[in-house]
């Protein structure tokens, strides 16, 4: 992964590294309402939402996607690059498991 688009580097204090080995990287994400994060990349991921989350993703081509998660919802995605904004009224709190080897 290009370090200039590494979520942990771009996300600043929003991301906290919980575990990393040669197969996975486990991150905790906490974004306050209105918070924005610059363009960054993820390999394939599984994410768990601790609470309600409402976010807008901006893709490299400028298109936007609104993402709404419920408490306890789990999502999976292949590799992607995006910028993020918490458009909700509550903190976005996710456990993000990045898969290094599939």
Residue locations for each model-derived region?
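Short beta-strand segments in beta-sandwich/barrel cores
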Residues: 36-37, 53-58, 74
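Glycine- and acidic-residue-biased ligand/ion/polar-headgroup-sensing regions
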Residues: 42-61
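Short acidic-glycine-tyrosine-enriched beta hairpin
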Residues: 61-79
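A short glycine-rich, His/Asp/Glu-containing loop-to-beta-strand
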Residues: 11-36, 43-47, 97
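Basic/polar N-terminal segments that are highly enriched at the extreme N-terminus
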Residues: 1-13, 101-102
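Ligand-binding loop in jelly-roll beta-barrel domains
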Residues: 79-102
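Histidine-centered metal-chelating micro-motifs
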Residues: 34-37, 75-85
């Amino acid at each position: 992964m290009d370090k200039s688009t590494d979520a942990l580097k771009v996300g600043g204090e929003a991301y906290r590294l919980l575990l990393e080995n040669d197969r996975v990287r486990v991150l905790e994400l906490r974004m306050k309402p209105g918070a924005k994060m610059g363009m960054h990349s993820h390999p394939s991921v599984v994410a768990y939402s601790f609470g309600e989350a409402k976010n807008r993703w901006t893709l490299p081509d400028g298109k936007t996607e609104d993402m709404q998660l419920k408490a306890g919802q789990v999502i999976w995605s292949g590799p992607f690059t995006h910028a993020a904004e918490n458009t909700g009224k509550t903190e976005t709190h996710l456990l993000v498991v990045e898969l290094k080897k599939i």
